[in-house]
């Protein structure tokens, strides 16, 4: 199969993966309107094409939290990444580090912090959920610090899990889920051998380290689901801000008032995100929410954005709308599922090439030159 874009990796991943895994990552909440709008709204952002600007010198490099990034992209935290490729978190982290961008480890990764951090030559980021078990949260933070993590991504848009209908249909959850997952694995032998057999242990490594016993998919659905905390408030985050002395990013901001609260709280950054359309259907796409948030807090903290980004062109669009950097999730996961570390490496190269083309044709020689002026106003702002 010819791979020329992230959408090609998605098609290939759908063939390779058992349906319960493909649809778990591909699906969204309820009827998935926001999931679709994340992509379509971003694709509808029109850029101003500029010509005769002498674009012989071009730089994608940017600075973020005292880190140099080869381009304004980081790999987003994705739960169960290690179920999509053998020791998937390690492979994805290595590809990101080799390209000069951050990898963000999920709380619910298969590989534990202690396995991934030593595998790369730059500090990774760590994502943490708000959970009722504060002991686990403190344990995870202490272990992240010990592993050299500098940047914490704190996800605040999951006080309860979203209603994801696809999971029940695919076998990820619901009646006879375990039996359906086994049958699906049997009909996908390449995945069954590479990940199902050779990728063991199929463990939630960070949780197992804390609990002292192996955890599996049932624990992911059970223990974690029952531990999300709907009572959380900004006050509950104060001890984390005091404990964590590195950059702290609040992920899951869609409203300008919440962005202002993040500034008051002392956050170093926010992620404008609707969790990839996986939490509340009908909320704004990240592309539509971003401009108002940027107007409210640009310059007070760093603004990151995710949800719907499928190409380097989309990265340029998000930056023009007000982001400093973006996170990509599904796009890298599909590449990882198809070709492992080499797939993520190729995907990042594709994103970089697409960014370069977009910047040349919009007359932006550096990331700092991408702005609202890069947009066709009546269509993109």
Swiss-Prot record:
Residue positions of the active site: 275 (proton acceptor)
Known cofactor(s): FMN
Main location: membrane
Domain FMN hydroxy acid dehydrogenase: residue ranges: 1-380
A GO-annotated cellular component: plasma membrane
SUPFAM superfamilies from the UniProt entry: FMN-linked oxidoreductases
GO molecular function: FMN binding; L-lactate dehydrogenase activity
Record EC number: 1.1.-.-
UniProt binding sites for FMN: 106, 127, 155, 251, 306-330
GO biological process: aerobic respiration; lactate metabolic process
Subcellular location(s) of the protein: Cell inner membrane
Protein family per UniProt: Belongs to the FMN-dependent alpha-hydroxy acid dehydrogenase family.
Function: Catalyzes the conversion of L-lactate to pyruvate. Is coupled to the respiratory chain.
Protein name: L-lactate dehydrogenase
Provenance organism: Pseudomonas putida (strain W619)
Gene name for this UniProt entry: lldD
């Amino acid at each position: 199969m010819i791979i020329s874009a992230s959408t090609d990796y998605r098609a290939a991943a759908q063939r390779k993966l058992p349906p319960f895994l493909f649809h778990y990552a591909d699906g969204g909440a309820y009827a998935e309107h926001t999931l679709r709008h994340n992509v379509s709204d971003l694709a509808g952002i029109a850029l101003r094409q500029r010509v005769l600007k002498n674009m012989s010198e071009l730089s994608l490099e940017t600075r973020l939290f005292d880190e140099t990034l080869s381009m304004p992209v980081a790999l987003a935290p994705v739960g169960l990444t290690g179920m999509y490729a053998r020791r998937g978190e390690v492979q994805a982290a290595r590809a990101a580090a080799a390209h000069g961008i951050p990898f963000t480890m999920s709380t619910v990764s298969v590989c534990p912090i202690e396995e991934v951090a030593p595998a790369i030559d730059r500090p990774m980021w760590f994502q943490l959920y708000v959970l009722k078990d504060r002991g686990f949260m403190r344990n995870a933070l202490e272990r992240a610090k010990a592993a050299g993590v500098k940047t914490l991504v704190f996800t605040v848009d999951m006080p309860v899990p979203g209603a994801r209908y696809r999971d029940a249909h695919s076998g990820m959850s619901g009646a006879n889920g375990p039996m359906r997952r086994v049958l699906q694995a049997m009909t996908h032998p390449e995945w069954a051998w590479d990940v199902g057999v050779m990728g063991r242990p199929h463990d939630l490594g960070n949780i197992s380290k804390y609990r002292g016993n192996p955890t599996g998919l049932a624990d992911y659905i059970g223990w974690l689901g029952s531990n999300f905390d709907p009572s959380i408030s900004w006050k509950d985050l104060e001890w984390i801000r005091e404990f964590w002395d590195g950059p702290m990013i609040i992920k899951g901001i869609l409203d300008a008032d919440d962005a202002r609260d993040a500034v008051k709280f002392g956050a170093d950054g926010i992620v404008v995100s609707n969790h990839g359309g996986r939490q509340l259907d009908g909320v704004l796409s990240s592309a539509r929410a971003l401009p108002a948030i940027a107007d409210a807090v640009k310059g007070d903290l760093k603004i990151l954005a995710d949800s719907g980004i499928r190409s380097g062109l989309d990265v340029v669009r998000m930056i023009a709308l007000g982001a400093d950097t973006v996170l990509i999730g599904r796009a890298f996961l599909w590449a990882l599922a198809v070709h492992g570390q080499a797939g993520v490496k190729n995907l990042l190269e594709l994103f970089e090439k697409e960014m370069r083309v977009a910047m040349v044709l919009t007359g932006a020689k550096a990331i700092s030159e991408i702005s609202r002026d890069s947009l066709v106003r009546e269509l993109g702002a």
